[in-house]
A protein has these predicted regions:
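Short conserved AdoMet
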Residues: 50, 139, 157
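Short, Lys/Arg-enriched, disordered terminal segments
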Residues: 1-3, 180-182
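Beta-rich strand-turn-strand
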Residues: 130-154
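Flexible, glycine/small-residue-enriched loop-and-beta-strand segment within the central core
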Residues: 28-39, 57-70, 74-139, 165-166, ...
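A transmembrane-helix-recognition feature enriched in membrane-embedded lipid enzymes
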Residues: 2-52
Length: 182
């Protein structure tokens, strides 16, 4: 018995068209140019994108209809947003260069190795640093930081910093007022 994909022919066709549209109409623009155009393309394919969200041209989005980005959310250069299930990026949250958001996996105890999917949530003011991996079903809570190259396979508590493989607690995140006020 061969591998059976969980995706319908309609889904595969929709993803093919999306990939061609993004490659031809968004990728040619350098870095931060044409943000409105890129948001419009994502919205045309069902993404829920705030007018201030930032998506770089080199970002890969598997299924835009399963992506939600709030105000000032950012998917930076080279981010791989493999959203077989939904991904929600909160207000002022940043996913930095070449990070990998992976909502899919396989059931290793299933002899047929069927695909499993679970949503990812990156809450307000969280930061997923460069080349970090966020696994299926993970919530990165408000204000949390996932250090560069962290492998995050469990939820991250609010206002904490995690890092390593697998990611472990490093310290609490404390904001200071750089303007000198109270």
């Amino acid at each position: 018995m061969g591998f059976k994909t969980p995706y319908s022919k309609r889904n595969k066709l929709r993803r093919l068209i999306w990939s061609m549209v993004w490659t031809c109409l968004a990728r040619p623009f350098p870095r931060s140019m044409a943000m409105g155009w890129k948001r419009m393309l994502l919205r045309a394919f069902g993404a829920k994108i705030a007018p201030t969200a930032v998506v770089y041209a080199t970002t890969k989005v598997f299924q835009p209809w399963l992506l939600t980005m709030d105000d000032y959310a950012c998917l930076a250069e080279g981010v791989d947003c493999y959203n077989a299930a939904s991904i929600h990026i909160g207000r002022n949250a940043t996913v930095s260069q070449r990070a990998f958001l992976c909502t899919a996996g396989h059931d290793i105890s299933d002899p047929h190795h069927h695909q499993t999917d679970a949503s990812i949530v990156i809450e307000d003011r969280a930061w997923v640093c460069a080349e970090a991996f966020i696994g299926q079903g993970v919530t990165v809570s408000e204000g949390a930081v996932c250090a560069a190259r962290a492998v995050v396979v469990k939820d991250v508590e609010s206002w904490t910093v995690v890092g390593g493989n697998p990611a472990k607690f490093i310290k609490k995140r404390v904001l200071i007022n750089v303007n000198g006020g109270g």
